Amino acid sequence: QEVLDTVVKPTVEAMVAEGIPFKGVVYAGLMITAKGLRVIEFNARFGDPETQVIMNQMASDLAQVIDDILNGKDPVIEMYTDRYTLGVVVAAEGYPEAPMKDIPLPDLDKENADCIVYAAGVKAGEQGLLSNGGRILLIAGQGETLQAAQDKAYRYLSANPIAHTFYRSDIGAKAIRFTEK
C-alpha cells in the first residue's frame, strides 16, 4: 500500500496534471533503505527479472490485458494468491562492467517442478547453450510461502552450479523478515 500511496498515485496524478497521456507499461525500480522506500528509476517497458517473476503470479492473459489497455478498456488483472514466486538472477563473472562470455551452461530443459529457468544472455553453441551477456539466467522458485519459494530457488542453484557465474544470496531475505513480524 505504501508503494501505491507514495509512488504510483502521485506519479499518475502528476502525469494527468501535466497533460501527459500514457498507455502502456510503466514499472518503478524501487529500493527499501533504512530511510524508507526510494525510487531508483521508472521504465516504460517490461523489466526482464521483474516480469519473469510477475508472469508466474499472473492468472490473466497478458495479451488480453495489453489489448484492453491500448483500446481504453479497464483490464481485468487476476493474480494467483495461493503461491509465491521468487527470482534469482545468475550473472556472468565480470558483470556488469565486462561479463565473461561463452560460459558452458547446463541443460535448461531438464524437468524441475519447483523452479522455472528463464534464459536471458544465452546463445546456442556447438555443444549446447553458452552465456552471451551479463545476466544469463533467472531461477524462479515457487512455493506456498515466500520462504518456500526462496528455499527452492537456492536449492536449485546449489544443485546446478555454473562455473564463472555468481548470484546474490539474499534475495527475499528482507521481505521474509518483514512478513514474519
Regions found by a protein language model. Give the residues of each.
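N-terminal loops that bind phosphate or other acidic moieties
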Residues: Q1
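Generic long, charged, amphipathic alpha-helical segments
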Residues: K101-L138
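Short beta-strand elements
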Residues: A28-I32, L37-F46, G121
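Active-site "cap" helix and flanking loop/linker of ATP-utilizing ligase/carboxylase catalytic domains
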Residues: L4-Y27, N43-D114
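Short, well-ordered beta-strand elements
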Residues: I40-F42, R135-Q142
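A cross-kingdom feature marking charged/low-complexity
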Residues: I171-K181
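Short arginine-rich
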Residues: R155-I171
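Short, well-ordered alpha-helical segments
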Residues: I139-S158
